[in-house]
Protein backbone atom coordinates (compact mmCIF):
# COMPACT_ATOMS: atom_id res chain seq x y z
CA UNK A 1 0.00 0.00 0.00
CA UNK A 2 2.81 2.38 0.92
CA UNK A 3 4.57 1.68 -2.37
CA UNK A 4 1.35 2.29 -4.34
CA UNK A 5 0.77 5.71 -2.76
CA UNK A 6 4.45 6.61 -3.14
CA UNK A 7 4.33 5.82 -6.86
CA UNK A 8 1.14 7.85 -7.29
CA UNK A 9 2.75 10.78 -5.47
CA UNK A 10 5.80 10.64 -7.73
CA UNK A 11 3.56 10.42 -10.81
CA UNK A 12 1.58 13.45 -9.65
CA UNK A 13 4.79 15.40 -9.11
CA UNK A 14 6.01 14.47 -12.58
CA UNK A 15 2.72 15.58 -14.13
CA UNK A 16 2.90 18.88 -12.24
CA UNK A 17 6.48 19.38 -13.41
CA UNK A 18 5.53 18.66 -17.03
CA UNK A 19 2.62 21.11 -16.88
CA UNK A 20 4.89 23.76 -15.37
CA UNK A 21 7.53 23.20 -18.05
CA UNK A 22 4.88 23.45 -20.77
CA UNK A 23 3.54 26.67 -19.24
CA UNK A 24 6.99 28.24 -19.01
CA UNK A 25 7.79 27.16 -22.57
CA UNK A 26 4.60 28.79 -23.82
CA UNK A 27 5.33 32.01 -21.95
CA UNK A 28 8.92 32.03 -23.21
CA UNK A 29 7.78 31.49 -26.79
CA UNK A 30 5.30 34.33 -26.46
CA UNK A 31 8.01 36.60 -25.06
CA UNK A 32 10.35 35.73 -27.94
CA UNK A 33 7.73 36.41 -30.60
CA UNK A 34 8.47 39.80 -32.22
CA UNK A 35 6.01 42.39 -30.94
CA UNK A 36 5.71 44.30 -34.21
CA UNK A 37 7.26 44.73 -37.66
CA UNK A 38 9.06 47.75 -39.11
CA UNK A 39 9.76 48.39 -42.80
CA UNK A 40 12.32 50.94 -43.97
CA UNK A 41 12.32 52.34 -47.50
CA UNK A 42 15.43 53.87 -49.03
CA UNK A 43 16.88 54.90 -52.38
CA UNK A 44 20.61 54.81 -51.67
CA UNK A 45 21.85 57.04 -54.44
CA UNK A 46 23.06 60.59 -55.24
CA UNK A 47 24.36 62.08 -51.97
CA UNK A 48 27.18 60.13 -50.31
CA UNK A 49 26.22 61.52 -46.89
CA UNK A 50 22.70 60.15 -47.24
CA UNK A 51 24.01 56.82 -48.54
CA UNK A 52 26.34 56.63 -45.55
CA UNK A 53 23.43 57.14 -43.17
CA UNK A 54 21.34 54.56 -45.02
CA UNK A 55 24.06 51.92 -44.61
CA UNK A 56 24.53 52.89 -40.97
CA UNK A 57 20.80 52.64 -40.28
CA UNK A 58 20.48 49.26 -41.99
CA UNK A 59 23.18 47.90 -39.67
CA UNK A 60 21.90 49.60 -36.52
CA UNK A 61 18.18 48.85 -36.73
CA UNK A 62 18.54 45.03 -36.86
CA UNK A 63 20.62 45.18 -33.68
CA UNK A 64 17.91 47.25 -32.01
CA UNK A 65 15.25 44.86 -33.30
CA UNK A 66 16.99 41.94 -31.60
CA UNK A 67 17.39 43.93 -28.39
CA UNK A 68 13.85 45.32 -28.20
CA UNK A 69 12.00 42.41 -29.79
CA UNK A 70 10.66 43.72 -33.08
CA UNK A 71 11.28 42.77 -36.71
CA UNK A 72 13.14 45.13 -39.04
CA UNK A 73 13.01 44.81 -42.81
CA UNK A 74 14.34 47.23 -45.41
CA UNK A 75 13.82 47.61 -49.13
CA UNK A 76 14.71 49.91 -52.01
CA UNK A 77 11.74 48.60 -53.99
CA UNK A 78 9.22 51.41 -53.59
CA UNK A 79 6.66 49.36 -55.52
CA UNK A 80 6.15 47.59 -52.20
CA UNK A 81 4.53 50.74 -50.92
CA UNK A 82 0.99 49.47 -51.41
CA UNK A 83 -1.89 48.66 -49.10
CA UNK A 84 -1.38 44.89 -49.04
CA UNK A 85 2.34 45.09 -48.28
CA UNK A 86 1.98 47.84 -45.67
CA UNK A 87 -0.72 45.89 -43.85
CA UNK A 88 2.01 43.62 -42.45
CA UNK A 89 3.86 46.47 -40.74
CA UNK A 90 3.16 48.71 -37.77
CA UNK A 91 5.84 51.29 -38.63
CA UNK A 92 7.23 52.67 -41.89
CA UNK A 93 10.58 54.47 -42.04
CA UNK A 94 11.83 56.73 -44.84
CA UNK A 95 15.62 56.67 -44.53
CA UNK A 96 16.69 59.00 -47.31
CA UNK A 97 13.92 60.20 -49.60
CA UNK A 98 10.16 60.36 -50.23
CA UNK A 99 7.68 58.82 -52.68
CA UNK A 100 7.11 60.13 -56.22
CA UNK A 101 4.56 57.69 -57.66
CA UNK A 102 0.93 58.91 -57.21
CA UNK A 103 -0.46 55.46 -56.35
CA UNK A 104 2.27 54.89 -53.76
CA UNK A 105 1.65 58.33 -52.29
CA UNK A 106 -2.03 57.56 -51.88
CA UNK A 107 -1.28 54.18 -50.29
CA UNK A 108 1.04 55.84 -47.78
CA UNK A 109 -1.50 58.56 -46.97
CA UNK A 110 -4.21 55.97 -46.30
CA UNK A 111 -1.79 53.92 -44.19
CA UNK A 112 -1.11 56.94 -42.00
CA UNK A 113 -4.78 57.95 -41.81
CA UNK A 114 -5.60 54.43 -40.64
CA UNK A 115 -3.18 54.60 -37.72
CA UNK A 116 0.13 53.42 -39.14
CA UNK A 117 3.38 54.70 -37.66
CA UNK A 118 6.10 56.64 -39.50
CA UNK A 119 9.58 57.98 -38.82
CA UNK A 120 11.24 60.14 -41.45
CA UNK A 121 14.87 61.19 -41.51
CA UNK A 122 16.54 64.26 -42.96
CA UNK A 123 16.10 64.27 -46.75
CA UNK A 124 12.72 62.51 -46.59
CA UNK A 125 11.15 65.96 -46.01
CA UNK A 126 13.11 67.76 -48.72
CA UNK A 127 11.18 69.62 -51.42
CA UNK A 128 12.40 72.47 -53.61
CA UNK A 129 10.94 73.86 -56.80
CA UNK A 130 12.68 73.77 -59.22
CA UNK A 131 14.79 70.70 -58.42
CA UNK A 132 14.68 66.93 -58.88
CA UNK A 133 12.44 66.91 -55.79
CA UNK A 134 9.83 69.63 -56.40
CA UNK A 135 7.10 70.47 -53.93
CA UNK A 136 4.33 68.64 -55.77
CA UNK A 137 2.77 66.75 -52.85
CA UNK A 138 0.73 69.13 -50.73
CA UNK A 139 -0.68 66.54 -48.33
CA UNK A 140 2.79 65.32 -47.38
CA UNK A 141 4.74 68.57 -47.20
CA UNK A 142 2.08 71.01 -46.02
CA UNK A 143 -0.44 68.94 -44.04
CA UNK A 144 1.42 65.87 -42.81
CA UNK A 145 4.90 67.33 -42.22
CA UNK A 146 3.75 70.94 -42.12
CA UNK A 147 7.19 72.21 -43.07
CA UNK A 148 6.51 73.17 -46.68
CA UNK A 149 9.60 73.53 -48.85
CA UNK A 150 13.29 73.46 -48.08
CA UNK A 151 14.84 76.94 -47.87
CA UNK A 152 18.49 76.58 -46.82
CA UNK A 153 20.96 74.56 -44.79
CA UNK A 154 24.09 74.84 -42.70
CA UNK A 155 27.47 73.62 -43.92
CA UNK A 156 29.73 71.76 -43.03
CA UNK A 157 27.84 69.18 -40.96
CA UNK A 158 28.35 70.15 -37.34
CA UNK A 159 27.03 69.16 -33.93
CA UNK A 160 24.47 71.40 -32.26
CA UNK A 161 23.14 71.84 -28.76
CA UNK A 162 19.51 70.77 -28.99
CA UNK A 163 16.70 71.77 -26.66
CA UNK A 164 13.84 69.39 -25.83
CA UNK A 165 10.61 71.39 -25.97
CA UNK A 166 8.14 68.70 -24.93
CA UNK A 167 8.92 65.97 -22.40
CA UNK A 168 5.38 64.55 -22.53
CA UNK A 169 5.83 62.94 -25.94
CA UNK A 170 6.82 59.23 -25.78
CA UNK A 171 10.02 59.73 -27.78
CA UNK A 172 11.34 62.63 -25.71
CA UNK A 173 10.16 61.92 -22.16
CA UNK A 174 13.49 60.34 -21.19
CA UNK A 175 15.72 63.05 -22.69
CA UNK A 176 17.50 65.84 -20.77
CA UNK A 177 16.60 69.51 -21.24
CA UNK A 178 19.46 69.93 -23.70
CA UNK A 179 21.94 67.57 -25.35
CA UNK A 180 24.67 67.63 -27.96
CA UNK A 181 23.74 66.09 -31.31
CA UNK A 182 25.80 64.12 -33.77
CA UNK A 183 27.16 66.23 -36.65
CA UNK A 184 24.44 67.04 -39.15
CA UNK A 185 23.49 69.32 -42.02
CA UNK A 186 20.58 71.31 -40.58
CA UNK A 187 17.61 72.42 -42.70
CA UNK A 188 15.47 75.54 -42.63
CA UNK A 189 11.88 75.39 -43.93
CA UNK A 190 9.45 77.76 -45.62
CA UNK A 191 6.65 77.23 -43.08
CA UNK A 192 6.79 78.39 -39.47
CA UNK A 193 5.83 75.22 -37.61
CA UNK A 194 5.02 77.23 -34.46
CA UNK A 195 1.95 78.63 -36.23
CA UNK A 196 0.53 75.20 -37.12
CA UNK A 197 -1.83 73.94 -34.38
CA UNK A 198 -1.45 70.34 -35.57
CA UNK A 199 2.33 70.34 -35.18
CA UNK A 200 4.04 69.68 -31.87
CA UNK A 201 7.69 70.74 -31.97
CA UNK A 202 9.70 68.29 -29.89
CA UNK A 203 13.31 69.40 -30.32
CA UNK A 204 14.87 72.61 -31.64
CA UNK A 205 18.34 74.10 -31.99
CA UNK A 206 19.35 75.87 -28.79
CA UNK A 207 20.66 79.42 -29.12
CA UNK A 208 23.96 78.38 -27.51
CA UNK A 209 24.74 76.55 -30.78
CA UNK A 210 25.25 79.78 -32.72
CA UNK A 211 27.20 80.34 -34.86
CA UNK A 212 26.24 77.00 -36.42
CA UNK A 213 28.08 75.77 -39.50
CA UNK A 214 31.49 76.62 -40.90
CA UNK A 215 30.78 77.77 -44.44
CA UNK A 216 32.59 78.72 -46.66
CA UNK A 217 29.45 80.62 -47.71
CA UNK A 218 28.14 83.04 -45.10
CA UNK A 219 24.60 81.80 -45.78
CA UNK A 220 25.74 78.37 -44.57
CA UNK A 221 26.53 79.74 -41.11
CA UNK A 222 23.53 80.48 -38.89
CA UNK A 223 23.94 83.19 -36.27
CA UNK A 224 20.39 83.40 -34.94
CA UNK A 225 16.85 82.19 -35.51
CA UNK A 226 14.47 79.44 -34.51
CA UNK A 227 14.97 76.01 -36.09
CA UNK A 228 12.82 72.96 -35.22
CA UNK A 229 14.64 69.70 -35.90
CA UNK A 230 12.25 67.05 -34.52
CA UNK A 231 8.47 67.26 -34.52
CA UNK A 232 5.24 65.32 -34.71
CA UNK A 233 1.84 65.92 -36.25
CA UNK A 234 -0.82 65.37 -33.58
CA UNK A 235 -3.24 63.93 -36.15
CA UNK A 236 -0.90 61.05 -36.96
CA UNK A 237 1.41 58.55 -35.30
CA UNK A 238 4.57 60.05 -36.74
CA UNK A 239 7.88 61.75 -36.01
CA UNK A 240 10.22 63.61 -38.34
CA UNK A 241 13.91 63.99 -37.47
CA UNK A 242 16.17 66.36 -39.40
CA UNK A 243 19.10 64.11 -38.50
CA UNK A 244 20.44 61.68 -41.08
CA UNK A 245 23.29 63.43 -42.93
CA UNK A 246 26.66 62.00 -41.94
CA UNK A 247 29.78 64.12 -42.31
CA UNK A 248 31.79 63.00 -45.34
CA UNK A 249 35.30 64.05 -46.37
CA UNK A 250 34.31 65.93 -49.51
CA UNK A 251 37.06 68.55 -49.15
CA UNK A 252 39.93 66.08 -49.58
CA UNK A 253 37.93 63.88 -51.94
CA UNK A 254 38.51 60.75 -49.86
CA UNK A 255 34.74 60.50 -49.27
CA UNK A 256 35.34 58.73 -45.98
CA UNK A 257 32.82 58.88 -43.16
CA UNK A 258 33.80 61.52 -40.62
CA UNK A 259 30.79 61.02 -38.36
CA UNK A 260 27.82 58.74 -37.73
CA UNK A 261 24.32 59.72 -36.65
CA UNK A 262 23.52 56.61 -34.66
CA UNK A 263 26.47 56.86 -32.30
CA UNK A 264 24.66 59.51 -30.26
CA UNK A 265 22.94 58.04 -27.20
CA UNK A 266 20.19 60.66 -27.05
CA UNK A 267 19.24 60.38 -30.71
CA UNK A 268 19.28 56.60 -30.39
CA UNK A 269 16.99 56.80 -27.35
CA UNK A 270 14.58 59.10 -29.16
CA UNK A 271 14.32 56.75 -32.14
CA UNK A 272 13.82 53.62 -30.03
CA UNK A 273 11.20 55.22 -27.79
CA UNK A 274 9.34 56.46 -30.87
CA UNK A 275 9.41 52.99 -32.43
CA UNK A 276 8.18 51.29 -29.28
CA UNK A 277 5.34 53.81 -28.93
CA UNK A 278 4.28 53.39 -32.56
CA UNK A 279 4.77 49.64 -32.74
CA UNK A 280 3.14 48.54 -29.52
CA UNK A 281 0.08 50.72 -29.82
CA UNK A 282 -3.06 49.71 -31.69
CA UNK A 283 -3.15 50.45 -35.40
Residue ranges and their predicted role:
Residues 35-128:
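Helical hinge/lid and interdomain linker segments adjacent to catalytic or ligand-binding clefts
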Residues 54-58, 137, 155-157, 164-168, ...:
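A structural signal for well-ordered alpha-helical scaffolds and beta->alpha junctions
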Residues 45-46, 80, 99, 125-127, ...:
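Short, solvent-exposed loop/turn segments at secondary-structure junctions
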Residues 31-36, 52, 60-63, 67, ...:
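Extracellular ligand-binding/catalytic regions of CAZymes and related secreted enzymes
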Residues 153-240:
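Catalytic beta-strand/loop cores that center a nucleophilic Ser/Cys/Thr
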Residues 98-174:
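A glycine-rich, often tryptophan-bearing local segment used as a flexible ligand/cofactor-contacting loop or short
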Residues 1-33:
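Bacterial Sec-dependent N-terminal signal peptides
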Residues 34, 87-88, 114, 167, ...:
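Residue-level preference for short coil/turn positions at secondary-structure junctions
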